[in-house]
Amino acid sequence: MSFLQKIFGSSNQRALKKMQVHVDQINLLEAEYQSMDDAELFALRDKLAKNYADDLSNLIPHAFAATREASVRTTGLRHFDSQMLGGIALADGNIAEMKTGEGKTLVATLPAYLNAVQGNKVVLVTVNDYLAQRDAEWMRPVYEFLGLSVGVIHSNQNFEEKKHSYECDVIYATNGELGFDYLRDNMALRAEDKVQCSLDFAIVDEVDSILIDEARTPLIISGPTNESAEYYVQIKKIIPKLKQQLREGTEEEPLLEDEIGHYMIDEKNRSVELTDEGYIEVEKYLEDLGLLQSEDSLYSVSNIKIMRYVNATLKAAYLFKKNVHYLVRGQEVLLVDEHTGRTMSGRRMSEGIHQAIECKEDVPIQKESQTLASTTYQNFFRLFSQLSGMTGTADTEAAEFAEIYGLNVSIIPTNQPMARIDNEDLVFLTREAKFKALIAEIELLKEKEAPILVGTASVESSEVVSELLKKKNIAHQVLNAKQHEKEAEIIANAGRPGVVTIATNMAGRGTDIVLGGMKSDDALEWGERHQKVLDAGGLHILGTERHESRRIDNQLRGRSGRQGDPGYSKFFLSLEDDLLRLFITDSRRALFERIGMGDDHIEHKMLSRGIENAQKRIESRNFDIRKSLLEYDDVANDQRQAIYSLRSQLLEEDNISEAISDLISEEMHVISEDFVPLESVESQWRLAELDRHLTEHYLIEVNIQNQVNQDKKLTPELIADLISNTAASRYKEKYISIEQNIEQLEKQVMLQILDVHWKDHLAEMDHLRQSVGLRAYAQKNPKNEYKREAFEMFETMLNAINTEAIKILFRLEIASEEEIQELEQRSLEAQKNKEMRLQQAKPDLEVGNENAQNTSLEPITRDQPKLGRNDPCHCGSGKKFKQCHGNA
């Protein structure tokens, strides 16, 4: 602690001191609210809103005191002072770090009621449907006692149910469903088809999971493309014939003949690349398969597409492991979330990797897809007028919360002193020695009848531990992505005496492990179990490896020691664990190996520092990745907001005919200037071409050549006005018979064209994003280039929307109002019946929704001179092809 901190206290201590003033005021008001009858508390909302509309400082104590009293009367739970501190932190738009078991669900009722009094919609965000429904039902009596309505948003609701839920005062919802509803609303063809409420105030539960772990996760609504899956099937045949190369050759130490291979794996950066020999070998196999013509080159521009299939198949084969990165359930490949250990239904990897894994596992290959609408959690949650959050582990990410979201972290003291004992890590030379020591520890603790939670980082590790326990005849239960349906039951029993539970990181975010197990009807029996566990030292956490993030390790520890209960945690590590193997230097590894003795563990401060520094480096790298994603997505987000704002205006306006008239005038002036430039002379005018263009594209006959022949005083400006006026008259005449309903037609045309162009624009932005990094070779800043080109593309898209809309409106043949209604109905049905899958993707991921059909493949032929791997790249970067577009 610094000298100044000793005098003034830390920033967190100073913030808590200010909040304590409010807590004291709330406690003074407690007797006053205890004296109120139920009817008075029910009607209090309007009274508080009237008396303290512009006085938040005085509103907080009254709103919080009322909520505390309502909770006591309905649930029997009284908010502790520490929970009041958490509520004040949330009300101020901060993140409240509150340890496991401190009652975050109850805390959320305080700022929720406060904001409802202020007239704000309150959204409480959870990580899954179960928690949203559980928390809503648990807290519903409190809210309804205070006159508030409560809604729950989940994935299985129909339109009417969801619409009703969003109309409530307090809404519980998952982060994914909120994001998808936002995207769906901005694809609606009628204003009444929107469901989502205004985004006023959000309380994000497990905020670190949603805003940090999921920050790189784009929310994508997508539809299928026509890419063939047969390429994966054919290229899969090549992979077993390739040999791995274990090191790069150097001048000092060139590769021996038997060391030369076809591909190299970089585990640290999770990449796999073909070597020069590998490219030659793959070309030969592709020719044998008929996918590449003889004498053609895999490096030519026309063959970039097939390289994508090769790269995806290599990654699927060597970087993604079954039961670690994904599971196969039935006929489907399900990704496993590295942070929680849960399967991620509906999520698919992009760049063809998911299809390649499906091919590898011999399950039906689903089609790739095209993005129809997308956003990121980072940008979606920044749409809320005020954002706050709760978690047990936020302090290690405080800098990121502040920089990205403008959220400060308030560390709330526990209601009872922490009694958990956190032991030093035990580090072994080998995984075998580590697991041997782990099993011995479990046997020892089981004799004491202590409940044991063994935390693993993957399904594979959990199954290894399970097999070892079976050999020792130690009864246990397993909670991983394969058994996630039993999660509630397993967690409920995890605190019983002598129970051994093996769990991946999914172990109970949002669910407490109660010492002695869940309380039963037999209070005496539960009391005996509870005391037995207390005597054994509480819940014992045994970690089998360190996670990349210190925060995830802290979450595992946080399962124990709730509300002042005793607890114990210890990590068993080995130098063969991924974190230590990839991020501990060779020199340090050699030192630790000299220190270690057989199956004994290593204890050394240098090792502890090395592990922590490795975690910090990874956390810093991941932060940089998330920050970079945001910088790019901010560009897309500005465009997204502009398009969605335009869509909202189109939906909400009763009549857009005036805007259409302006567009017609603007479009006609642009066309006129293309053929009759301003400041030009008559000899430069292309009048015949102008007449032909107007007739062919807009069915407008102006006969401008005759007009000019008859009136020599016509200037380019007057010609443009003449064309504009003629077009306006023609448009009015065209729709005179359906004048009352013309706005319906105009809206439908504008919306559909806007959506089509926006979809294509998203694809172009994806392509730009993937290729813009190459600009660095030309000494240009990729981010600046991305911003510049994205802006130009956006302007081009807006102009194209206007042009196409006017063309269609002039060419569309509508004879009656019934035809307009039929057109609108067809559009709505197409929207409902469109085969789309919703996706919470991994970074830049896509999704398909149909099984790909086997099709015969034509060999890819080149239409450019053969390009060698060491030739200059076609993009003009000046780099060799293998270092540029040929880089796997």
Q: Residue ranges of each PLM-predicted region?
A:
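Conserved P-loop NTPase motor core
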Residues: 1-596, 645, 662, 666
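Generic detector of short, well-ordered, non-transmembrane alpha-helical segments enriched
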Residues: 3, 397, 498-499, 639, ...
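Alpha-helix capping and helix-coil boundary motifs
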Residues: 50-59, 157-158, 293-297, 521-525, ...
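Active-site-adjacent structural elements in folded domains
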Residues: 108, 438, 858-860, 868
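Extended, charged helical/alpha-beta scaffold domains that provide interaction surfaces
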Residues: 326-334, 340-347, 563-564, 571, ...
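A short, cysteine/histidine-rich metal-binding "knuckle" motif
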Residues: 867-873, 877-888
